[in-house]
Structure formats: structure tokens, C-alpha cells
Amino acid sequence: MAFDDPAPLPRPSALQAPQARHLRAALADLSEITPSSLAALRRDHPALSPDLISAIATQARLQTRAAPRIGDLALTWILEDAALQQVTRLDVARYRAGELVRRLGAGAVADLGCGLGVDSFALAEAGCTVLAVERDPWRAE
């Protein structure tokens, strides 16, 4: 996907809307998302677009994949497959942030090309003031 292409998914803000969050929580309770469970969700939530329901199901799958790498952040962050493939493990990001602060002190840091923002998150946790910059507008939102 080129940076100028429209995102193939609903905007991250749509995935954070109250109805979408409720549906994400319901999907988290399923051991597996199947075509029949998606059809049931579409039937039970006619006010939500099929594209949004599919995107929420994708988020549930990505959360499962992301949990070993970023822990509980996977439950609340909006994820994207390509960025998830490159994401720094949270424990590694925290270690690096701690080392940076130990050696240089907590100061202002720019994370250019921050992706999902795990390194930025860890730097902020360590006491840094972080400017997180992402070129991809979908990820940046």
C-alpha cells in the first residue's frame, strides 16, 4: 500500500467508537472467529456496516497475534498487519528506553517513523517527552 492510497479499512476512529468497542469486546470472548459467527454479528448489529464488522473482526485477530509482543496494549490499540509485523516487543522497547534514559537522561525524543508507537510508548513511560511521527495517515490517526 502506498502512503497516498486510501486506507482499505474503516478509519481508526470508527474502530474506537462505542458500538465498535462493544463488538470488539464480544469478539474477544470467542475462541475463533468463523464465517458463521461473522454472519451472526452482521445480523445482530444491522446498524453497523459489514465493512466495519469485518474490520473489527480483523482487529480481534490482530489483537490475538499482538498480545505476545505488546501485552495488554493489544487490547486497546488499533492495529494494522504490516505494522504489527515490524513492531518492537514491549519488553525490548522498555529495556531500550530505560537504557536511553539511564545514559542520557529523560529528555525530548522524536520517534520518526514510529509505526504502531510501541517505542514511543516505552520512552514516555520512562519519562521522556516524545514526539511520535508516522507518515502513514491510517497509522498516525
Residue ranges and their predicted role:
Residues M1-E141:
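SAM-dependent transferase fold signal centered on methyltransferase-like domains
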